[in-house]
Amino acid sequence: LSTKLSKKSFKPSRPPKFFRPKPNGMQRTITILPVEDALVYQAVANSIASNNYESLTKNNAFIFGSVLNEEVKEGITLLNNEDAEFYFFKHYLSLYKEFSNKVNESIELGLKFVLETDITGFFDSIPHYNLLSVLSDEYKVEENVLDLIGDCLNIWSGTNDGLTPGVGIPQSTEASSFMANIILHNLDNILIEKALPYFRYMDDIRIFGDTQEELRE
């Protein structure tokens, strides 16, 4: 794989996909990436995460979905520890419990209104151009890596019925959850600056306020 990448001969493969029912009756497209594709995708995510750990975790008091583990900042030096047990994200169950606790605490404070929303078909609707632009402008990802990821995302897009070039990232991978958080990072900054109680678990968002007007703003 490393030889293919260095010679720029690596080509992503079209992955198998299937639908998983959601509680609301809709369907989620699950993508099973081939091993080499998954390794490349995760390696890119690892590099971005370790190089930008501080900026990516500054909002962790408000963000609870797919939160980076502290070991991420050590980057490839983790490979020097043969006994290390490393996970890219903190465990989701404890994070979701913390998210729920924060929501309940805001309710107990007596805040009268809550805006509760999520982004329909979030992973399937992420524009590749937007993601690649953020990776380039804010995280200084090199052009050859952007080209590689762009090619991969196009091949991985859509459903078994066909591609959706330029739109959608594959669900069921940690790298995609990481990229999804990157897309929402600027939204986090905007809402946190408004100083309203704001909490997010991936694309599941809660904003609390004393009036409907301040939430509409």
Task: Spell out what each predicted region is.
Residues S6, P15-F19, Q27-L33, K97-I107, ...:
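Catalytic micro-motifs at enzyme active sites that drive phosphoryl/nucleotidyl and oxygen chemistry
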Residues S13-A43, N60-F86, T159-N181:
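Short, conserved non-catalytic motifs in the polymerase core
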Residues T31-I32, A43, Y53-K58, S125-H128:
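Short, conserved acidic/polar surface loops in the N-terminal third of protein domains
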Residues A38-S50, D151:
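Short, hydrophobic/amphipathic alpha-helical patches that form generic packing surfaces
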Residues A49-V114:
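Active-site-proximal segment of RNA-dependent polymerases
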